[in-house]
């Protein structure tokens, strides 16, 4: 099983890449965590935002292979504690399908992406900046793995 973070936006600051890589390298080889960036379409003053979101959604879904699980990150999704995320991670592992964690752009996810979602996860009721979301997801996946593995990181 692979976990793929499919996120709209690129050209993140160096500290974001460093933070992401810190957790990717800590995970074991049997739990690879990958980042797939979808370029953010330019939003001009007269942009057709609905069309741009739809295009981003198509690009996101293009990263998903048939049979893979889609989990959308949405403000109105279900909040998971670390223990609940660890339980989900174990279910995903037993299911043996790749997991795609989908993070939309500034206006959220395309309806087509949400319609394909098997699970909706909310990191927080707060609005979080996309750079922090990437690092937070990496850290929480690592923390969930340590909990399942009996590693002392999660106390």
Curated annotation (Swiss-Prot):
The keyword Transferase is annotated on this UniProt entry: yes
Keywords attached to this entry: Cytoplasm, Methyltransferase, rRNA processing, S-adenosyl-L-methionine, Transferase
Localisation: Cytoplasm
Pfam families in alphabetical order: SPOUT_MTase
One CC-aspect GO term: cytoplasm
Residues annotated to bind S-adenosyl-L-methionine: 73, 104, 123-128
Primary localization: cytoplasm
Gene Ontology MF terms: rRNA (pseudouridine-N3-)-methyltransferase activity
Catalytic activity: pseudouridine(1915) in 23S rRNA + S-adenosyl-L-methionine = N(3)-methylpseudouridine(1915) in 23S rRNA + S-adenosyl-L-homocysteine + H(+)
E.C. number(s) listed in UniProt: 2.1.1.177
Superkingdom classification of source: Bacteria
Protein's UniProt keywords contain Methyltransferase: yes
UniProt-listed InterPro entries: Alpha/beta_knot_MTases, RlmH-like, tRNA_m1G_MTases_N
SUPFAM superfamilies: alpha/beta knot (SSF75217)
Family assignment from sequence similarity: Belongs to the RNA methyltransferase RlmH family.
Protein function: Specifically methylates the pseudouridine at position 1915 (m3Psi1915) in 23S rRNA.
Subunit structure: Homodimer.
Protein name as catalogued: Ribosomal RNA large subunit methyltransferase H
Organism of origin: Stutzerimonas stutzeri (strain A1501)
Organism phylogeny: Bacteria, Pseudomonadati, Pseudomonadota, Gammaproteobacteria, Pseudomonadales
């Amino acid at each position: 099983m692979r976990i793929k973070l499919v996120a709209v936006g690129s050209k993140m600051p160096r500290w974001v890449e460093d933070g992401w890589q810190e957790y990717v390298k800590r995970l074991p080889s049997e739990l690879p965590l990958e980042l797939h960036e979808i370029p953010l379409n330019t939003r001009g003053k007269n942009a057709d935002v609905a069309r741009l979101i739809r295009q981003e959604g198509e690009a996101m879904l293009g990263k998903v292979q048939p049979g893979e699980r889609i989990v959308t990150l949405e403000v109105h999704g279900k909040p998971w504690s670390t223990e609940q995320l660890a339980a989900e991670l174990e279910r995903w592992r037993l299911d043996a399908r790749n997991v795609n964690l989908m993070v939309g752009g500034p206006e959220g996810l395309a309806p087509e992406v949400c319609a394909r979602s098997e699970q909706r996860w909310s990191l927080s009721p707060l609005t979080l900046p996309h750079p922090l979301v990437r690092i937070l997801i990496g850290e929480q996946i690592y923390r969930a793995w340590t909990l399942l593995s009996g590693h002392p990181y999660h106390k």
